Amino acid sequence: MGALRGRWAEEEALRFLLGKGYRLLWRNRRTPFGEVDLFMEKDGVYVVVEVKQRASARFGAPLEAITPGKVRRLLQSARFLLGRDDLPVRLEAVLVHGTPKDFRLEHLVLEL
């Protein structure tokens, strides 16, 4: 997510997930496979959260930016951060539609 532009969207996504009982483990953690926006835990499952924001549909919907390659890299990043690949990991996305003054959130589980 772009540094300053997307920071507010990431803050809103984090607030939303914390309100749903998620626990933050790492934020903006870099790995050899890319950056993980939010690495969280919920009910004993590790959760990698990708946050995507779009002010308008001009450049496509936020979900369109999460390609199969991105999903693969997120899973590789999770395994790297955990140091093993036998723990339950779920990939999720928080899509932020709009601007800081007028937005809505969409929360999805990504298929592996």
Swiss-Prot record:
GO terms for molecular function: nucleic acid binding. Belongs to the UPF0102 family. The lineage of its organism: Bacteria, Thermotogati, Deinococcota, Deinococci, Thermales. It comes from the Bacteria. Gene3D superfamilies: 3.40.1350.10. It holds the Pfam family UPF0102. It comes from Thermus thermophilus (strain ATCC 27634 / DSM 579 / HB8). This is UPF0102 protein TTHA0372. PANTHER family: UPF0102 PROTEIN YRAN.
